[in-house]
A protein has these predicted regions:
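Short, locally clustered residues in the helix-turn-helix/winged-helix DNA-binding domain
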Residues: 20
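N-terminal secretory signal peptides
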Residues: 1-14, 23, 29, 35
């Protein structure tokens, strides 16, 4: 074990020396403390002295002003323009697993577009017996399904590949959301058109926005769990999430989830579009390219404590919480380390639903006030174990961007303030 460190890195040996010294004289405290009379309890407050807001004041419910900081945020220097850019879900401030549409990250290639349901058309062509054009009402007539799935951008955590970069879990891991979608299985629409559904065929799905964003999907996946969705979390899709209709490709990278879908073409082979050649592929140091890397491997991150969620209560009882997910299926276990990966404790998993959806995990523990190096490590039902960053670098080199599912480390100091670091 080395004492070397670079950038925001730290060594496990140096950390253990500091933690032992910091925690030597700390006494633990209970979750609640006895105190003198609190005027918020003993005195009548303004909100109990006048009538509140009527039922018609806010026809569509909005968050209260005291939660106005729980919003999507972008990194201004990341892209040249917000029109072709991305912002980040405030996962540090959310609980459970369902992401409100208004908090769910956005990724656009030419900006979000406005389209009325009445103007919506979806064409299915190519290797089909009868090319069809559906309007919005047509799609709603087919048998529908409801499923909860996560959507993760392939570049989520991509800026962290070279080292600890951004000091906030919203920015390191916030290119993800998890919503309940209502839609029609893609296979239903393909059957309606008499498509050639041989497993050696592909479908090419194209969006209606100015970028004409499109991706090729193997027929085997298209016939499995892909949805043509028109609702999210029980309501119409928001504009930024593809209103009125988008594609849902469970477990696969977010670029496949085409928004405002206008055309589905059945083809003999992959189209090799811009988004699957010059984009969303990675070139190794030996010149070979890594492509068709659709599935998002098992990943987890601690959301609290984290740089945007300091420990405010001091030593004593605490809950370490986070999120885990896998594009291969379901999370079966999450381990948490408080010493940078030297020792691990198994976390408690929240109630699970659909596969390929977020899982909430908790470690109910005690904090003695000493510094911590917090990590989470996820496992899924295929037996896959979330790797360290060094393991990913050994496999893919130093210049990766996409599919970074490495273990994340937060350094928590004696004051409860967290920082993004990399351990070696």
């Amino acid at each position: 074990m080395s004492d070397n460190k670079t950038g925001n890195g730290t060594s496990r040996r140096a950390f253990l020396r500091g933690a032992t010294a910091a925690g030597a004289g700390v006494m633990t405290a209970g979750a609640a403390k006895a105190q003198s009379a609190d005027p918020l309890i003993t005195e009548r407050q303004d909100w109990a002295s006048y009538l509140g807001t009527g039922v018609d004041e806010v026809p569509y419910g909005m968050p209260i002003e005291f939660e106005s900081n729980v919003v999507r945020r972008n990194v201004e220097w990341l892209t040249a323009s917000p029109i072709s850019s991305i912002n980040f879900t405030p996962i540090h401030a959310l609980e459970g697993t369902i992401t409100p549409q208004g908090c769910a990250f956005e990724r656009h290639h030419s900006g979000a577009i406005e389209m009325r349901k009445e103007d919506y058309r979806l064409m299915i062509n190519g290797l089909v017996e009868k090319p069809l054009v559906f309007n919005y009402d047509d799609i709603e007539r087919f048998p529908r399904e409801n499923h909860v799935y996560f959507c993760e951008c392939a570049a989520n955590t991509g800026m962290e590949w070279a080292g600890a970069q951004l000091n906030g879990v919203q920015f390191t891991h916030g290119m993800i959301h998890n919503m309940e979608y209502t839609g029609v299985p893609l296979r239903t629409l393909l059957q309606e058109a008499g498509a050639d559904m041989s497993l050696d065929k592909w479908v090419y799905v194209e969006g209606a926005d100015a970028s004409s964003n499109g991706r090729s999907i193997p027929m085997e996946k298209a016939l499995d769990d892909v949805l043509v969705a028109f609702k999210a979390n029980g309501e119409a899709l928001r504009m930024e999430h593809g209103y009125p209709v988008r594609l849902i490709v469970p477990g696969w990278e977010g670029n496949m989830w085409i928004k405002w879908i206008r055309r589905i073409e059945v083809v003999d082979r992959a189209v090799e579009s811009r988004e699957e050649t010059s984009k969303y592929t990675e070139v190794y140091e030996d010149g070979t390219a890594r492509k068709w890397t659709w599935v998002m491997d098992a990943k987890s991150v601690i959301t609290s404590p984290s740089p945007q969620m300091p420990i405010k209560h001091g030593p004593g009882q605490m809950v370490i919480s986070g999120l885990a997910w896998s594009g291969h299926g379901q999370i079966t276990r999450v381990d948490v380390s408080k010493d940078g990966g030297i020792t691990w404790e198994t976390a408690r998993l929240g109630k699970q639903g659909d596969t390929k959806a977020l899982t909430r995990f908790y470690l109910d523990t005690q904090w003695d006030g000493a510094p911590m190096l917090l990590q989470a490590r996820a496992m899924d039902d295929t037996g896959y174990v979330q790797p360290t960053k060094d393991q990913l670098r050994a496999e893919r080199g130093e210049n990766g961007v996409y599919h970074n599912n490495c273990i994340q480390t937060w350094y928590v100091n004696a004051e409860g303030i967290s920082e993004n670091v990399e351990v070696s």
